Amino acid sequence: MLDVRKLLTRRPLLFDGGMGTYYKTKPGQECEQANLTDPEGILAVHRAYLAAGADAIKTNTFSLPRLAAAQQPGWEQLADAGWQLAAKAAGETGAAVFADLGPAPDTENNPAEQVYLAVAKRFALLGARNFLFETLSAEDGVLEAIRALKQTVPEAFVLVSFAVLPDGYTREGRYCAELVRRMAQSGVVDAVGLNCVSAPGAMRALVQQLGDAGLPLSVMPNAGYPVVARAQVRYQGKPEYFARELSRLASEGVRILGGCCGTTPQHIAALRTALDALPETLPAAPAAKSAEAAKPVVEMDDAFLRKLRAGQRVIAVELDSPKDADLTAYLEGARRLQAAGADLLTIADCPIARARMDSSLVACRVHRELGMNVLPHMTCRDRNLNATKALLLGLYAEGVREVLAITGDPIPTAERDEVKNVYQFNSRKLAQYIVSLAGEGREMPSPITVFGALNLNARNFEVELRRAAEKLENGMSGFLTQPVLSAQAVENLKKARETLGEQAKILAGILPVVSQRNAIFMENEVNGIHVDEAIIQKFEGLDRAAGEELGLEVSVQAAKAAAPYADGFYLMTPFNRVALMERLIARLRTEVTD
């Protein structure tokens, strides 16, 4: 069998092309099932790619990590058959065989690391020494699995390949250059690259962003972009164009080339011919595209961040956006809060999954008209990656430099036939994506500061703290907490300060309770809020005015209890009672923050 490491010292390595899009599966059947139901058909595909000139072929096992994660019976037999068919075909020409592993889902009960390792070890027992982890959107668990694999098979050659959109980001919002850098610095990955999603021309542009990764670079684009014709998905990229673009990459230093979706033996044959026509001496690695002179970053003066970083206690006030299309009263309320001394206005993103005026659009209007710092909430519930990026670019252009990234309340079950959740990622991955948009040559010259939520009322606060630490690792700068309405919430706030450190900016949540009915409702129907029973009883029999007075006093005392462990306060306006918030801000300014 071909020695991949030796070949790469002499010339580029040519892989095969797509399996699933070339081999026509039966309706409802996984392509991998054909390893058992149609072995001759799969063997014929392998042989066609080898006849086209491929130096290496992939086992027909892309979906195995997903099947293994689901504990689907028989995945081991699919692995065995997939390996045996590829090895049989490669044995006829001396080509290399790569055990092919697609993305594994990462869950608490079945971490991706364990899934990858189980599948890779199965292949290793069959004799595999070359492994391809492909079409990944993130590195979750893959490096840990490779480290463990190499303890068992130290001679293993491992190629890790990411699926990257033409804008340089994966579907999980990870920036390609950062992913490649992490693989190159791991010490356990032998080659790294890009595959799928993008067509040859776009992938060539992506490679120019990467420069010299320090490892052999792999490129396996799709034939083109998919179109639907007669209820079938087709790729229209021509073999000649595919070969021309990839041979250019080879002449620029890419060492491993092949095809993904829509590519056929004709594409690989054309690329084989083009590669054979190249001079024997080629660059060892691609050169980075020379960047244009960077424009000087003129960063706006952010009074909220400046005050927060200087150690002064800040006050953020949440005011829910209107349920209708009239913003007049809202803007007047925002003006009053600003005049009262609020440092920041926060705007929820359709709380409890009920549609309101868009939080980001409202934030832009407030910032533009009042010059006030704003913090729009951004959930993962309603937008995919494209919509999220488009919104972030618009926010940046409008001068908004802070967002609150949250996963978001799910759509009520009864409405899910008409309104769908999106949840392409969670708040941690959203934060990581937002931070990754800033930097030299990227979409934003300076970063957007990302805050997250911290639930002081979580039943298992240790788990909540672990998640908070992960949020910080993924780029968040601080947290807005759920309301402090119990002694346990204060104790958890203290624990958060001790655990997360002074670098994590924490704004303690203060929500005035205004009636016993209001308190009982929040205790029983609002996720993340716990109202102490003693507080609920205090409101019994009070009218509106008396209830508001008591709510004000309870809020001030809660703020005083939270103050030693907080960098400021996050005030939530009940029922749009701006006058109450004006009084609360005044009390906090005189009794707590100053």
Enumerate the language-model features and the residues they cover:
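Domain-level signal for soluble alpha/beta catalytic cores
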Residues: 1-594
